[in-house]
Amino acid sequence: MSMLRYLYPAVCAAVLTGAGAVHAAPVDLTGWAENGLVNNGAGIWTVQPGNDSVIQSRNGNPTVFYDATPAGASAQGEQLSGSIEVLTTGDDDFVGFVLGYQNNEINSTTADFWLIDWKQNDQNPAVDGLALSHVFGDLTTTSGSGTGGWWNHADPINEAARGTNLGSTGWNDQQKYTFDLTFTEDLIEVFVDGQLEISYSSTDHGSTFTDGSFGFYNFSQAQVEYAGITQTTLPPTTPAAVPLPAGLPLMLVGIGAFGWMRRRQAA
């Protein structure tokens, strides 16, 4: 019986060693910060024990709770995961997320980030359902009565896509949903309860996406919990070659020499 039969699995294992598994790491939300339209304090974000969950308790203007740590300023190449739940039955407005967000960008005259928002019920001119919008331009124009385009996705909040299944379906009171957000310079993906709802590429957009932080978003909706937040580094788009272990060439030479000797003895 050929020795190769026994050595082949060992060779394969040696090649694969070091490829490494990807693991989700808990996110410490104590380094995150609130920004509110017009003035900070539009939302009250209270980090919960364990530091990987937060509850937003104010019904007010658009508010963002974003990763303000130096490491969090570049979220591209990462996936943010966790759960979202509206804990009350008393309102029906917007919950969601931001991608590629910079400090105080919600009040910028030159904003450029992405908004994922989900409304429970129609409320003219706002409609229910899950949507992705490009927030681009002067947001100081949105601070008037009714907070402008935040309500109905009017410029400079420019709707780009709606959820495949939830595009016209609102969230339910006191129901926990899981979410996974993929963000690279070329791709935004939104999964809800394991189902891909939105997949939007730089080709769809016409250019690559601007980098920035992950964040949570509420508008006119209180008692929203984001829980069990984790972050995972995504594998590269083009997988890098796995380097050969240092001893592998000698192992292969030995296998070749053994085979040559067996053939010579059999001759």
Language-model features: where?
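Short, charged juxtamembrane terminal tails flanking transmembrane helices
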Residues: 264-267
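Short glycine/serine/threonine-biased micro-segments
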Residues: 16, 94, 98, 213, ...
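Extracellular glycan-recognition regions
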Residues: 25-239
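N-terminal regions of proteins, emphasizing targeting and processing segments when present
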Residues: 15, 19, 31-33, 42, ...
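Small side chains
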Residues: 18, 82, 215, 257-259
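Gram-negative bacterial Sec-dependent N-terminal signal peptides
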Residues: 2-23
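Hydrophobic alpha-helical segments
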Residues: 10, 21, 79-80, 93, ...
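A short, hydrophobic C-terminal helix/tail in secreted or cell-surface proteins
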Residues: 241-261
